[in-house]
Structure formats: structure tokens, C-alpha cells
Amino acid sequence: MRARFKFLIAILVVSISINVVIGYYYSDKYTLTQLSDKFTNFQTTDFEPVQIPEIYEEQVLMLSFEKNVFSKQDFTPWKTKLIEKFQNVFEIPDYDDITLMPVEEISEDEYDEYSLNKYSTSAQDGDNIIFYELKPKDNAKTTSCEDTICYSTVLVIPGSGNQGALDAINQPSQFSSYYYHKGIAEELVRSGYVVFVIENRGWGERGLDVQMNCKQPDVYCSGNQLHRHLFNLGYNQYSLQIIDTMQLLKHIHNLDYVNNEKIAIAGLSLGGPVSIAVSNLSPNVSGTIAASGVISQYKTVGSGITPGMLKYFDQPDLAASLSPKPLYLSWGLNEKSEFGYEAKNKYSAELVNNSYKLLDAEEKLVIVIHNEQFNHGHTFEMTSLTDFLDNTIG
């Protein structure tokens, strides 16, 4: 009996010691109020925009659609000033000034319905661009271009994350369990489109070991750390991605089997604003898709990729300037933070719709608010997206 009593005392001492250590750890990090909230409050709250003090808002959105466009006659002069200011703020060159570099084939794979080629080329600043081409084996989306068969083509710009292009082309990787692009490139090539997928700078196969003690698996950490470090060095990763994508699009324009009258650009998340920008700055883009990509940085105090931008314009202004060209925008009701805010409040959707309505082009605009559960709705809604492509470049 005495031995059993001693054993129970020992267990009690160990238990108390462990709880003291845990208590010390949390008391060193949190106040009692924070601890109470941390362990008792499991309710999530809806996203609410941050209220900025008025002293910082005396001169904002000076080139916005709402402040400058009141009639059809206002639209073209406004767009010209807007795009000029956009290029100035983000240091984006003209399409004609983009230099094409030699393209090297890295690998080639054959599947039952399509071929998959991997390429690399030097970027404008010497970085290494990686991209994939998926080409169908049937002629479902082809037309006759002079003396050859040419294809309707889609350029896909993935969202952030080290899932990267492999997510979009549905190839396995160490991040497969984090994929959220629904293998869009594979889905589209099976429908007959030639599909190109660019690897975003700083992510996936273009990621860098930035030695920032990122936890494994490193899905987002290293890319975000690199973005911030480049920003402090005077580089904007968003700008660099736009320039990379313009270069790839120019390469696509020079392929004899691509129908330059039937090219669409599709972006998810980060890829959304990139697709909007590239479509505004480049010729021969017949349709633009931005899924969970266009948000009001002004209303939601967004991602921080836009230094100085809100003095002049916001993301939905850039989307509105695409009118009357075919445009597809989507958001998910189950998305978190600013994306869910846009889905529920429709701020950007209504602003862009007003632009298309002004130019009598509402039939060219598709706005989808979906109820996807996958990845909390931060993904492509494939049915409406493929319908849009079939109706514009299919």
C-alpha cells in the first residue's frame, strides 16, 4: 500500500511540474485575458474593413473610376491616364519593349490525351522563367490560320504558394495535399485548349531557400519572406511577375500554332490581379479570368503589394478599365478575410459592372459568387469558367 501511495505522489508531482512549465510558457507569451480568449473563444468573426484615420485619406483614389468617369466620353481618357500611372507606380515597361529570349526545352512527356512540355527562358532581369505547355492531341478547339492549324489558347497564372505550377497541371509533389487549383490546366487541355502555365517568381520551382527558419512543410513561408526581403531591397515581386507573364505571352503570340485572336488569361488569387494587369498592357487578349483575385485594397487594407497605389487607383479600377473586353470575375462565399468580404458585399463586382454598363457591354462581363466548399471557396469554379472560355475563345 505504501509503495502504491508513493507512486501516486510521484505522478502528482510530475503532473504539477508539467502544468507549471506550460503555464510559465503561456504566461510569458500572453496576458490572462489573452489566455482566456485563446482557450474559450472558438467563434470566428466576419471580416470587417479597417478604419483609417481621416488625416491619411485627404488625397486617395484620385484616378478611380468612380471619381473620373461619368459618361462614355470620359472612359478612354480616364483609362489612358490610369494605365500610364499604373505602369509608372509599378515600373512596368510597354509590351513592345519586352525582349524575347531563347527558350530551352527541359522535359517532354506524353499522355493519352495531351503532351506536356517544360521550358525555361531568361527573364528581362536575368532570372530564370519556368513554364509548362500542355497541347491536346485532338483538334476540338482549332481553326485554320493561313497554312496551318492553330489552337485556342489559355495562359494560366497560379496563386501564391510553393504548390506552384504543378498544382495547376495536376502533377504530384510534396505539396499535393495543399493543392487548390483543381488541376485547371489538365482540365482545359482535355477540352481541346492549348494551355500554358507560368511558375510564379519566388514560388514552387522558382522558390529560394531564404534561410528564414520556415517550418516544414514550407507551403507559403519562404515565398512570403522572399517577397518582403525583395521589397526592402527596392524590388516588387508583383511587378516582376507581371513582366515575366508579359514576356511569356509575347512568346505565345509568336507560335504559329496559337490563334492570336483566341487567347485568354486565367489567374487565381495572386494570379488574378496579374491577369488583369497583363490583359490591360498587352495586345491580343480575348478574355480575362480573375478568380478570387480582385479585391479593394482601399476597403480591405489588403496584401501590401501595392506601394503608393491607393493615392491614385484600386484593383477594381484596373478591372473596370478592361471594359468592354470579355471579363470573368469570381469570389466564394466561404472564403476568409477580404475575399469573403468581396463575395458578400460585392463592392468590386458592382464597380466593374458599372463600367461595363456604361459602355453597353454587360453581356461581356461574367460575375460569379459561388458556394464552393473546397479550400474554403478559394479556388476556381470550373463550370462557369469553362462556359466563359467556350463562349469567348472556344
Predicted regions and their residues:
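N-terminal cap/lid segment of alpha/beta-hydrolase-fold proteins
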Residues: D94-D147
